[in-house]
Amino acid sequence: MASKIVMSSKTVKTSDEILCEGELEKRSDSLFQVWKKKRCVLTADRLRLFSGKTSPAKELFFHSILKVDCVEHTSKYVYFTIVTNYYKEIDFRCTVESCWNAAITMALIDFQNRRALQDFPRYRYQRSESEMPSEPGEQSALGP
């Protein structure tokens, strides 16, 4: 199954908008560490992994992902690891043509940038309040 990648130039993405859809292989945590094919859907805030038609999807939310590490390129596969905030490593591989690693990395960067922009006004407000003089006639150390 070929992956379908849809990258839009819109600055605001909804969490339901599908950015990429297709097949990805996940290495199992079992003793033999076999590669299992998963149907995957990438949105602006998560990666959904489907094992079968009836089982519910496992979701990796971007707020719990620290980074995506590209481990190895071969002629057939790209091996990469998703590292969670708790430093759990989840190994994946995809065909070179599918570019899943790049799609997930770009979506994660976009998510982190949107989150930083949302937090910026709050940070700026907290910073300006901490720099205000405590008494009306008092000047800050940086003032004239």
Curated annotation (Swiss-Prot):
GO terms for molecular function: phosphatidylinositol phosphate binding. The keyword rRNA-binding does not apply. Coiled coil: none annotated. Residues 18-111 form the PH domain. SUPFAM superfamilies: PH domain-like (SSF50729). The keyword Phosphoprotein applies. It is a peripheral membrane protein. Disruption phenotype: Mice are viable, and show overgrowth of placentas with expansion of the spongiotrophoblast. These larger placentas do not confer a fetal growth advantage. Keywords: Cytoplasm, Membrane, Phosphoprotein. Transmembrane segments: none annotated. Disulfide bonds: none annotated. Changing R39A: Impairs the ability to rescue growth in cdc25ts mutant yeasts. It is found in: Cytoplasm; Membrane. GO terms for cellular component: cytoplasm; membrane. Induction: Maternal Phlda2 allele is activated, while paternal Phlda2 is repressed due to genomic imprinting. Specifically expressed at high levels in extraembryonic tissues in the developing conceptus (at protein level). Expressed in placenta and yolc sac. Expressed at low levels in fetal liver and kidney. It comes from the Eukaryota. The Phlda2 locus is imprinted. Loss of imprinting results in overexpression, leading to placental growth retardation phenotypes. Belongs to the PHLDA2 family. The PH domain binds phosphoinositides with a broad specificity. It may compete with the PH domain of some other proteins, thereby interfering with their binding to phosphatidylinositol 4,5-bisphosphate (PIP2) and phosphatidylinositol 3,4,5-trisphosphate (PIP3). Plays a role in regulating placenta growth. May act via its PH domain that competes with other PH domain-containing proteins, thereby preventing their binding to membrane lipids. This is Pleckstrin homology-like domain family A member 2. It comes from Mus musculus.
